[in-house]
Amino acid sequence: MIDENHPMRAAGNFFGRRHGKPLRPHQSNLFEDLLPRLKLDLATPAPQDLRSLFEAPVETVRMEIGFGGGEHLHHESGRYPQSGFIGVEPFINGMAKMLAALDQAPRPNLRLYDEDATAVLDWLPDASLAGIDLFYPDPWHKRRHWKRRFVSDANLDRFARVLKPGAKFRFASDIEHYVNWTLQHCRRHAAFDWQAESPADWNDAYEGWPGTRYEAKAFREGRRAAYLTFIRR
């Protein structure tokens, strides 16, 4: 039965390949031992107070979708120990890098999920997140694949449901078409405001931004990034 309060998940995947290079033995062990301790259990109802998901006492909860190798998420969760973080990454090698970082420097304010982010969004209570980050998502360059882009009307509806009023949706990309696509979708959505006042508001990286390996590669190849911030009304 379909829950009429939640949008249906799209039939197609929003992500590409699940696996790249073979995992080393230690990485495989982390998937067996560490990930089960950190992974959200969507088979049980989400707590109305998401702060109870974390070992550490936290004040607010944020979510990063598609964290890649985890550079930003690991950095932010260490920088803001008073905030809880939910990180979602279906790409196995990216999750392996994140688990290795957590093995060396644990984060009691961090939980993970290694499958479809829309399942997490549909599981979360209304107005439960202080922010959502979506950095360098797969742009799905071919026109016939644009429907797989994570920024869509259906997913913005999901964001609007789980974000608190005044919460931020942050989006970064080095693909101009995807940047424009996101601007168009968010600016026509009734729940979001884009409050940029000058080019610096999208040309300059976010305060405290650590950069990522993907971003560094894009810069080496001559591409520039845009950093967009939308506010939940």
UniProtKB/Swiss-Prot annotation:
The active site is at D138. InterPro entries: SAM-dependent_MTases_sf, tRNA_(Gua-N-7)_MeTrfase_Trmb, tRNA_methyltr_TrmB_bact. Keywords: Methyltransferase, S-adenosyl-L-methionine, Transferase, tRNA processing. Pfam families: Methyltransf_4 (PF02390). It is an enzyme of class 2 (transferase). It catalyses: guanosine(46) in tRNA + S-adenosyl-L-methionine = N(7)-methylguanosine(46) in tRNA + S-adenosyl-L-homocysteine. Pathway: tRNA modification; N(7)-methylguanine-tRNA biosynthesis. One of its GO terms (cellular component) is tRNA methyltransferase complex. S-adenosyl-L-methionine binds at E64, E89, D116, D138. Residues 1-22 are annotated as: Disordered. Substrate binds at K142, D174, T212, R213, Y214, E215. Its EC number is 2.1.1.33. Gene3D superfamilies: Vaccinia Virus protein VP39 (3.40.50.150). One of its GO terms (molecular function) is tRNA (guanine(46)-N7)-methyltransferase activity. SUPFAM superfamilies: S-adenosyl-L-methionine-dependent methyltransferases. Catalyzes the formation of N(7)-methylguanine at position 46 (m7G46) in tRNA. Belongs to the class I-like SAM-binding methyltransferase superfamily. TrmB family. This is tRNA (guanine-N(7)-)-methyltransferase. It comes from Brucella melitensis biotype 1 (strain ATCC 23456 / CCUG 17765 / NCTC 10094 / 16M). The gene is trmB.
